[in-house]
Regions:
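Conserved AdoMet
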Residues: 1-37
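Conserved beta-strand segments of alpha/beta enzyme cores
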Residues: 13, 68, 94-96, 190-193
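Conserved SAM/SAH cofactor-binding pocket of Class I
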Residues: 29-127
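Class I S-adenosylmethionine-dependent transferase superfamily signal
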Residues: 34, 60, 132, 154-158
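Helix-to-beta-strand junctions that scaffold the AdoMet/dcAdoMet cofactor pocket
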Residues: 91, 136, 162-164
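Mobile active-site "lid"/loop adjacent to the S-adenosyl-L-methionine
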Residues: 119-150
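Conserved Class I SAM-dependent methyltransferase catalytic core
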Residues: 145-208
Length: 210
């Protein structure tokens, strides 16, 4: 995908380069779940934490014509790419992208929050496929010493910004389910279900704010 600077994801083709993760088919589960839990004509506000190329947020906005979305990413290069993709898909009138880390983002209240944060622990990064570790941005993969450092920040921020009964969809590592569920419950989230990926690993937790 990096060689041709494009990648098909959901129903669109997105511009990508070495500054963003290549969208994975497993991540399309996030979009399916948002569609499943929302109405087509609903006017909802959605936040994408760690937006990267913008592919998740923009795919949802293509399916939900009355949604408005915001995406944040700590990488300026990523935000430039997400803005480019929004313009290319004619969705820039319903999206805003911000260069920001999770802790310092204070804008808005949201009906839906989605996030695919870095969740790979430091030591495991060395064991990844060579194509991944050599070409994809470490910033988007590195979840800190135990793999939870960014997940904790995302859960804390979502708890502050999500509306009551709001939908939170979080992608996780295959061995992180139990600890993340505990974190979510401690922050006042009700666990609706855990989704598996195509390899039958736990991959997404769907919850709502009580």
């Amino acid at each position: 995908a990096y060689l041709i600077n494009k990648k098909e994801f959901w129903k669109e083709t997105f511009y990508v380069n070495k500054d963003v993760l290549i969208p994975r088919p497993d991540t399309e589960h996030l979009i399916e779940e948002v569609i499943k839990y929302t109405y087509e004509d609903s006017k909802l506000h959605i936040l994408d934490i760690g937006t990267g190329s913008g592919c998740i947020l923009l795919s949802i906005l293509r399916e939900r014509k009355k949604f408005n979305g915001k995406g944040i990413d700590i990488s300026k290069k990523s935000i430039n790419i997400s803005r480019y993709n929004a313009k290319k898909l004619k969705l820039n009138n319903r999206t805003k992208f911000y260069i920001s880390d999770v802790d310092n983002f204070l804008i808005g209240k949201y009906d839906v929050v989605i996030s695919n944060p870095p969740y790979i622990e430091n030591l495991s990064l060395k064991c990844l496929d060579r194509d991944v570790i050599n070409f994809e941005p470490k910033l988007a993969l590195d979840g800190g010493k135990d793999g939870f450092s960014e997940i904790i920040k995302v859960i804390n921020k979502t708890s502050a910004l999500i509306k009551k009964n709001g939908l939170f969809i979080l992608e996780i590592g295959s061995n992180q389910k139990n600890k993340v569920i505990e974190m979510l419950k401690n922050k006042g989230f009700y666990i609706k279900k855990v989704l598996k990926d195509y390899s039958k690993n736990d991959r997404c937790i769907i919850s709502t704010k009580i």
